Amino acid sequence: MKGRKLEVYLGERFVGTMAQTADRRVAFAYSEEWLDNGFAISPFSLPVEQKVFVPTSQAFSGLWGVFADSLPDAWGQLLVDRMLKARGILSADMTQLERLAIVGDSGMGALAYRPAWNIQQDAAIGDLDELSAQCHAILNHEDAGDLDELFQMGGSSGGARPKIMTDEWIIKFPASDEMKDSGTMEKAYMDCAADCGIIVPETKLMPSDVCAGYFAVKRFDRRKTDGHIERRHMLTAAAILEVDWRTAAMDYHTLMKLTKILSLDNREDLEQMYRRMCFNVFAHNRDDHAKNFSWIYDEQMDCWHPSPAYDLTWSTTYFGEHSTTVDGNGRNPGMKELLAVGKAAGMNAKNCKVIAEEIWEKTRTLEATYQGWKS
């Protein structure tokens, strides 16, 4: 794929055109069709206006956050770069437009990019243990066997852990430095979160002969309606705020404010975000960065609701603190900070305390079981 323009679609609706500038930033303009009956695909950065939008932030290497959300993260990017290298293409020479063209219509969320750079064929999921071994081979810089197969199944995925995707499910494999029961741990965390009143997607353990099972989560950016798969437009907090998720630059105050604004002050949505904050603190999920919170657009109501919770597991960070601070405290937040965030968001103080105490109690066995986990 060579060219300096790319068209953006949502289903068969023409959203707009992206074009690369001389300094390798990617400008965007809505189509006339979208200006007549569309919505702001990024609520703060890209209002529905007849103008050319040029990103000023370098958080996403010249892209607006909404489009950067379509790109794969660490694991998917590794697969893309390995696949390009196998074809004699230097990854450093690739533009952001070309990387989006590789994503085509296979990315997370609802946006699709045309013309797509079709460089792989459809692949069927085979033996999961064999796929896991191939993933580990790639991480260890070894011969991985059928690279095209792995790319097709995981080249558009987010997150750092090896994974494969189908139209309805994401299946995760342990990374090389993880214990083999990482799947059972994440399943336990998601089950506990549901018990804590947090909305989570359907999950299950896929059978394995070499570990206790591979964690599988049902995709919430896809919805089956009358046998048809509907793609749902969603954005991460990083994309909405145009911030680099790899830096700890966010507080739960911000997430609560975002939820109030995006959901049009929906009290249930606000309580969901509060519950997730309490769970992350009490269950020691410190990898709570800005790409681990997403909102899904409701076109009928013209508002955004928090997506089901995801990536809930025992985790730490290299700096030993939460990626998202709690009332300014990232190292050891507790009840005081949680209640302060709830109060600032306008929640009932008594209700906040009841929720926090309930989640603390429900996470005791879970947190103790996995204390000291090396992630």
Annotate the PLM regions.
Residues M1-A290, S294-S375:
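Phosphate/dinucleotide-binding and metal-coordinating scaffold of catalytic cores
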